[in-house]
Amino acid sequence: MENTIMENNVLFGKHLIACGDSFTAGDFTRWTDSEGRAAKESPLVYDSEWGCYKTFPWWIARRNNMKLTNLAKCGGTIAISKEHLADPENVEIGSRHPFALETYKNLGDDVDYILIMYGLNDMYHTNLGTIDDETNETFYGAFNVVYKYLITKYPFAKIGAIVCNAYLSDEYAEAVRETAVKWGIPYLDLMKDTGISTTLNKKGMCDEAREIRNAQFHVNENNKHPNHKAHELMSTYVDDFLRRI
């Protein structure tokens, strides 16, 4: 039976690399579990064996016996920050952990699946740019730089983009879609796809529905990041997405 499950599960034993910001890395600040344990002290939200929060990539990896490398950083962007571009002497180039600076070149050789979800910090801290940009100094350009490199370096890896479903502006969401289409990268649109459940936000939701969902899936009133239930739910449809790309 175990061999049958392994043979029929395309994700089983594969290496998943997750790239993004705090919505992928996990942010449970100002939160405690029912026993008063905070964040990394609580087994409810933190895996001490793997040294990472139990965000949606963790759920996928644990469920399918995958190797997980979570490269997401709280506050992270894909492009170099406009603060650094405006004042390079006083703002470090790596202050926002820009994925398109060096990280995308350092994924190693053992790569099966790559998930990329950026935009929430970029819309405040990076320049949008245009679809024709070929620079890591704009949001559009950073995706172009990263995708060109990844499909060249890893021709047989499965690469997928995610349009985040929380607070992302229309312009930055559209940039994620357009660059994915440009480079032939499949994407999961959490903002517009009506065929999946929502956790925090979705295009067209009424204010009442959004208020109910936010109360259910925010860490708490003082932390608007996804809670552990939101990550578990999100993992189910990202899992399905990975199986289709």
Language-model segment annotations:
Residues 1-3, 118-119:
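Charged, low-complexity intrinsically disordered tails and linkers
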Residues 17, 69, 158-160:
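A structural signal for isolated positions on well-ordered beta-strands in alpha/beta enzyme cores
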Residues 15, 35-132:
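Conserved SGNH/GDSL esterase-like catalytic core that processes O-acyl groups on lipids
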Residues 26, 77-80, 169, 195-197:
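Generic structural signal for helix capping and beta-alpha/helix-loop junctions
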